[in-house]
Design a protein with these regions (language model features):
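C-terminal helix-rich "cap/oligomerization" subdomain common to oxidoreductases
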Residues: 1-5, 71-73, 301-336
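N-terminal Rossmann-like dinucleotide-binding module
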Residues: 1-51
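Predominantly a Rossmann-like dinucleotide-binding segment in NAD(P)-dependent oxidoreductases
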Residues: 128-204, 208-211, 336
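Basic phosphate/pyrophosphate-binding loop/patch that engages nucleotide-derived ligands
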Residues: 113-121, 135-150, 249, 253
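Beta-loop-alpha module in the N-terminal Rossmann-like domain of NAD(P)-dependent dehydrogenases
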Residues: 51-114
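Active-site loop of classical SDR/Rossmann-like NAD(P)-dependent oxidoreductases
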Residues: 39-42, 286-300, 314
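Contiguous beta-strand/loop segments that form the cofactor/metal-binding neighborhood of enzyme cores
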Residues: 189-262, 292, 296-310
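C-terminal capping/lid region of NAD(P)-dependent oxidoreductase domains
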Residues: 6, 120, 147-151, 331-336
């Protein structure tokens, strides 16, 4: 792990489905992609064809054994994320691991222990932090435009599709859970990014519509040590795809709607609320973000993690905390 900071990392992508393809496109021609790896040889080959000089393989051990590979992007089913990340960091490879990073927090703690031993940098793939509206919200919050934060509300959902309850996400052995560990973790991560950790976790997960052994809706009330609250709902019975995040401070609020595509145009509306104007809000400031660059920006951040030797954010600590929240909600659903 002692390569020069200015050296260009060389990558491999493990998992060549929809997200793996997004990751390859986000890499672009630089940094170099040496391998695509997937249990489906045809899928690995198809993705390798999009990156000149890339080799398709079906055995991840070949990737980990190649000393030229600096970093791996792991975008498999949830059940394979932590085992592959653990093998990667033990081999001295940096890793960008797609959310949620593991089936549970225990798996992710093992990755963290190994990363501390080898010095590998591990970033969790929560690309929503890199959406334009989220970055603008972060800028406004950090500048004090909202004053001290009080609470936030988040809703995220889709309506599934025919046969959704027979896909891998409906199998807890492969997914670790349902809608909470799928889209819900994005909400938990964003809430933690703005408010901090949540020692108080309340809520429940339930299955209302889909014929599956995992949840299709989750409702969360999370509180920081200072009492700031995150009120979250994740759903795959949201018949019209929806993303909404509202952040409230003492002197203003932000509303983020949409993520682009089927979730509608991505827009941030900032409502200043000076104390002297209480009850008479000033005209809002509206910012629109027609282009999603989140995947590319997240990849750039990961490359900088490696080059600068900095701790990724979100990294393993944030990923573990998010999964601890998930586990506490699932325990409540089971009467624990």
């Amino acid at each position: 792990m002692n390569r020069a900071e200015t050296e260009q990392p060389q990558f491999a992508v493990i998992g060549c489905g929809l997200i793996g393809r997004k990751r390859v496109l986000a890499l672009g021609p630089n940094p170099p992609l040496l391998y695509t790896c997937d249990l489906d040889a045809a899928r690995a080959s198809a993705l390798a064809a999009e990156a000149p000089g890339c080799t398709a393989v079906t055995d991840a051990a070949r990737v980990f054994a190649d000393p030229r590979v600096t970093a791996v992007i792991i975008s498999t089913l949830n059940a394979s994320l932590a085992p592959l990340a653990l093998a990667a960091v033990r081999a001295g490879k940096h890793a960008l691991v797609e959310k949620p990073g593991a089936l549970n927090a225990t798996e992710l703690r093992a990755v963290a222990d190994a990363a501390r031993s080898t010095g590998a940098k591990v970033r969790l793939g929560y690309n929503h932090r890199f959406h334009g509206a989220m970055l603008k919200a972060r800028e406004l919050v950090d500048a004090g435009a909202l004053g001290p934060l009080m609470f936030l509300r988040g809703r995220y959902g889709h309506g599934g599709r025919k046969g959704y309850d027979r896909e891998w996400r409906a199998d807890p052995a492969l997914s670790g859970g349902g809608e909470l560990i799928d889209q819900g973790v994005h909400l938990i991560d964003l809430a933690g990014w703005f408010l901090g950790e949540f020692p108080t976790v309340e809520g429940h997960a339930a299955t209302y519509f889909w014929d599956m052994a995992v949840d299709d809706n989750a409702f969360l009330s999370l509180r920081t040590a200072d009492g700031q609250t995150a009120w979250l709902h994740a759903s795959c019975t949201e018949w019209k795809n929806l993303f909404s995040l509202e952040i409230y401070g003492r002197t203003g609020k932000i509303i983020i709607d949409g993520l682009g595509g089927s979730y509608g145009p991505e827009r941030l509306t900032y409502y200043p609320m000076p104390v002297e104007m209480l009850g008479k809000p000033t005209p809002p400031q509206i910012h629109e973000f027609p282009t999603d660059r989140s995947w590319a920006l997240e990849t750039e951040a990961f490359v900088d993690d490696i080059r600068l030797g900095r701790d990724p954010s979100p990294g393993l600590a944030e990923g573990i905390h998010t999964l601890e929240v998930v586990e506490r909600i699932y325990a409540r659903a089971k009467g624990g």
